[in-house]
From Swiss-Prot:
Lineage start: Eukaryota, Metazoa, Chordata, Craniata, Vertebrata
Chain's gene name: Pdcd6
Organism, scientific name: Rattus norvegicus (Rat)
Keywords in alphabetical order: Acetylation, Angiogenesis, Apoptosis, Calcium, Cytoplasm, Cytoplasmic vesicle, Endoplasmic reticulum, Endosome, Magnesium, Membrane, Metal-binding, Nucleus, Repeat
Assembly: Homodimer and heterodimer; heterodimerizes (via the EF-hand 5) with PEF1. Isoform 1 and isoform 2 self-associate; probably forming homodimers. Interacts with CPNE4 (via VWFA domain). Interacts with PDCD6IP; the interaction is calcium-dependent. Interacts with RBM22. Interacts with PLSCR4. Interacts with ANXA7 and TSG101. Interacts with DAPK1. Interacts with SEC31A; the interaction is calcium-dependent and promotes monoubiquitination of SEC31A. Interacts with ANXA11 (via N-terminus); the interaction is calcium-dependent.
Chief location: endoplasmic reticulum
Residue ranges annotated for the EF-hand domain, each copy included: 23-58, 59-89, 90-125, 126-161, 162-191
Function: Calcium sensor that plays a key role in processes such as endoplasmic reticulum (ER)-Golgi vesicular transport, endosomal biogenesis or membrane repair. Acts as an adapter that bridges unrelated proteins or stabilizes weak protein-protein complexes in response to calcium: calcium-binding triggers exposure of apolar surface, promoting interaction with different sets of proteins thanks to 3 different hydrophobic pockets, leading to translocation to membranes. Involved in ER-Golgi transport.
Name the record gives this protein: Programmed cell death protein 6
Biological processes annotated in GO: angiogenesis; apoptotic process; cellular response to heat; COPII vesicle coating; endoplasmic reticulum to Golgi vesicle-mediated transport; intracellular protein transport; negative regulation of phosphatidylinositol 3-kinase/protein kinase B signal transduction; negative regulation of TOR signaling
Length: 191
């Protein structure tokens, strides 16, 4: 058996709070049509990736794009229709606002100190060593900082892991006891 700890804070869980209102539907429809290159009525992960900017002149993380599409694709069509796209638009816009809030030096990147503030703001109480692990895991450019798209991905993964942990933390004391196979099941449901 293995034990793992998480100290839940109030409302712990990364993610943007309810953000700004959506732009008008005609604006979003025009954006949708520009992104839907093949005119299928569905934006694929490749189309969305090409349309997104992470602010570093590198392609948006394809894993992040697939994660976002899977959250909003209610019909398992490997893409989002216009109705679902409005949710994607709001989700990404809300994340941009969160990112800008914690990017205190306006570098377009989140460093370890800014990440710690962001996660603390989400209710997480994690060690400096764990913040180092997150930076190493989600820093695709090897600069000790996380770009916007990788910040989203890191928060998505952290939330999924936290959700799984909470299912096993029945007494909500921040400790769980799981068998090796349960542990593997938890990990493989994320990767």
């Amino acid at each position: 058996m293995a034990a793992y700890s998480y100290r839940p804070g109030p409302g712990a869980g990364p993610g943007p709070a309810a953000g700004a209102a959506l732009p008008d539907q005609s604006f979003l429809w025009n954006v949708f049509q520009r992104v839907d290159k093949d005119r299928s009525g569905v934006i694929s992960d490749n189309e969305l990736q090409q349309a997104l900017s992470n602010g570093t002149w590198t392609p948006f993380n394809p894993v992040t794009v697939r994660s976002i599409i899977s959250m909003f694709d209610r019909e398992n069509k490997a893409g989002v229709n216009f109705s679902e796209f409005t949710g994607v638009w709001k989700y990404i816009t809300d994340w941009q606002n969160v990112f800008r809030t914690y990017d205190r030096d306006n570098s377009g990147m989140i460093d370890k100190h800014e990440l710690k503030q962001a996660l603390s703001g989400f209710g997480y109480r994690l060690s400096d060593q764990f913040h180092d692990i997150l930076i190493r895991k989600f820093d695709r450019q090897g600069r000790g900082q996380i770009a916007f798209d990788d910040f989203i991905q890191g928060c998505i993964v952290l939330q999924r892991l936290t959700d799984i942990f909470r299912r096993y933390d029945t007494d909500q004391d921040g400790w769980i006891q799981v068998s090796y196979e349960q542990y593997l099941s938890m990990v493989f449901s994320i990767v």
